[in-house]
């Protein structure tokens, strides 16, 4: 049988950036890697209700900079920034170096693979029919400009005795085109019948400039909108 390579792994350095970017000598590499794992595990557990998309980690000059990509930044920041300050102290204690936390808002959660997968799992845990949850996710993604989306669920669907896999696709999802921007994510729904796995592939279009173009587009998206100049008022003066 044909097997599928991990869509994010095969595109690393081509259209996908790394989630951890730092350099370390042989002595410190394992410690840094384990520290990253612990930080991600802690933040995922603490922010399970904050629509967490991904966590990126950088280590400039004996410190750690964590960027939390979330659809609900208000939940992460908390009242007057209290919650984010608690997180910063906890991350500094785990990593053993001074920590800085940045919050990045995900503007279109319907086009984020991880958030779509988590949305489907939460619906399955609330006993929503799996076909309805899949179809709703696909329709929302296509409505907001996705070029294609595929959703796959597998397990004891609807409480069936025998586990099976069902999938639904709309549009194009070219997994072998390296310049294709494919957002792939997985999630698990813990139901009374057992665990149901959810996989999501979202095709957002082709990237022609490589990783530099991806980074430039991300920076442009995160930049705050400039206020429009009021030409009428200036003319009146």
Curated annotation (Swiss-Prot):
Top-level taxon in the UniProt lineage: Bacteria
Keywords, alphabetical: Ribonucleoprotein, Ribosomal protein, RNA-binding, rRNA-binding
SMART domains (alphabetical): KH
GO biological process: translation
Alphabetized Pfam families for the sequence: KH_2 (PF07650), Ribosomal_S3_C (PF00189)
Coiled-coil portions: none
Location of the KH type-2 domain: 39-107
Molecular function terms from GO: mRNA binding; rRNA binding; structural constituent of ribosome
Cross-referenced NCBIfam families: rpsC_bact
PANTHER family documented for this protein: 30S/40S RIBOSOMAL PROTEIN S3, SMALL RIBOSOMAL SUBUNIT PROTEIN US3C
Quaternary data: Part of the 30S ribosomal subunit. Forms a tight complex with proteins S10 and S14.
Function comment: Binds the lower part of the 30S subunit head. Binds mRNA in the 70S ribosome, positioning it for translation.
Record's protein name: Small ribosomal subunit protein uS3
Organism: Aeromonas hydrophila subsp. hydrophila (strain ATCC 7966 / DSM 30187 / BCRC 13018 / CCUG 14551 / JCM 1027 / KCTC 2358 / NCIMB 9240 / NCTC 8049)
Name of the gene encoding the protein in the UniProt record: rpsC
